[in-house]
Regions:
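Gly/Pro-rich active-site loop or hairpin
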Residues: 62-125, 134-143
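Amphipathic, non-transmembrane alpha-helical secondary structure
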Residues: 10-17, 21, 40-47, 72-79, ...
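Conserved residues at the C-terminal ends of beta-strands
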Residues: 1, 88, 131
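Hydrophobic faces of well-ordered beta-strands that scaffold small-molecule active sites
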Residues: 30-32, 54-58, 83-85, 126-130
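Active-site acidic/histidine proton-transfer and metal-coordination neighborhood
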Residues: 1-55
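C-terminal helical cap(s) of enzyme catalytic domains, especially alpha/beta-barrels
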Residues: 139-156
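Short strand-turn motif at the edge of the Rossmann-like AdoMet-binding core
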Residues: 34-35, 61, 132-133
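A structural motif corresponding to the C-terminal end of an alpha-helix
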Residues: 18-30, 115-125, 155-156
Length: 156
């Protein structure tokens, strides 16, 4: 829930506190992916859970496609919790009734040069994994993934 006063919010906090406590016993972390909630809501949830093994898998396209944040600005809010990054491109929703669209990397609205620069500024040195969910046929998918990888390598 985006409202921390929602009756379900305390249940989510309790469940995550339990899960992360159990994972910590085994030296494991729990990562939540960005997307359906604004970055400040995810940060508040992490802070309310209060365990030091709860982090974020940052997906810039999800933040755009759900209309929740500019991905570069979102790093100002969540940067210290980012432990994994999806390289995925997308656009903001065009109506209030549907999600934005996914695009091949470098063809959508994610400002990848600015995004990579901001990742470096916050000291992020973890993985950047290409995520590609567009069904375009095997050969076209392969080509767009290869082109996206080359584009990312040119700005890393």
């Amino acid at each position: 829930p985006t409202n921390c006063r929602d009756v379900n919010y305390t249940g989510v906090v309790s469940a995550l506190r339990y899960i992360t406590s159990e994972l910590k016993k085994h030296g494991q972390n729990f990562l939540m992916e960005t997307g359906q909630e604004p970055p400040i809501v995810l940060r508040r949830l992490i802070e309310d859970v209060g365990n030091d093994n709860l982090f974020v898998n940052y997906d810039p396209a999800n933040l755009m496609m759900y209309g929740n944040a500019n991905p570069v600005d979102g790093l100002n809010v969540l940067g210290q919790y980012v432990r994994s990054v999806h390289a995925k491109d997308g656009s903001y929703p065009e109506t209030g009734y549907e999600l934005g669209s996914e695009f091949p990397i470098g063809k959508g609205k994610v400002d990848f040069p600015g995004f990579i620069k901001k990742l470096k500024e916050i000291g992020y040195d973890g993985p950047v994994s290409v995520e590609y969910e567009i069904e375009a046929g095997n050969e076209r998918q392969k080509q767009e993934i290869i082109e996206g990888k080359k584009y990312l390598e040119s700005i890393l």
